[in-house]
Amino acid sequence: ALNLYHEARSERTAGMWAVGDVTINRVKSISFPNTICNVVKQGRMYESWKTKRYPDLSEEERIYYPVKGKCQFSWWCDGKSDVPEELDSWYRALDIARLMIDSDIGLGLTDGADHYHADYIDPDWNDHMILITTIGNHKFYKSIR
């Protein structure tokens, strides 16, 4: 739900659902991690100085943070608070996320897209993708395999 909120809170329901669709498509792909949380948090991490200085700590006890600007979803590693402030959008994101997870469905709005970006930017990576559709302020792409 946090991913839907931060990536598409200004979008209509279809735009928010499409972002969720991409997240689910990534979970189902062998090219990405196999859980929603790991898909959202995918990217470079660094270990906190608080745990790095203790070599005997287990991996579960270590604290990691995302490297700013080096993650799949920009809100995850932008250094800002992730606490939702726009409650109407947050509740809508929660409802959509619950529906998608509980029913294990997507509406197929993105026809299998596994990437997207805001329509006001033109990243280099989209040169190697197939443009599927535009929904709201986002363009959705499918990887060429």
At which residue positions do the language-model features occur?
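Bacterial extracytoplasmic/cell-wall-associated proteins, especially those involved in peptidoglycan
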Residues: 1-145
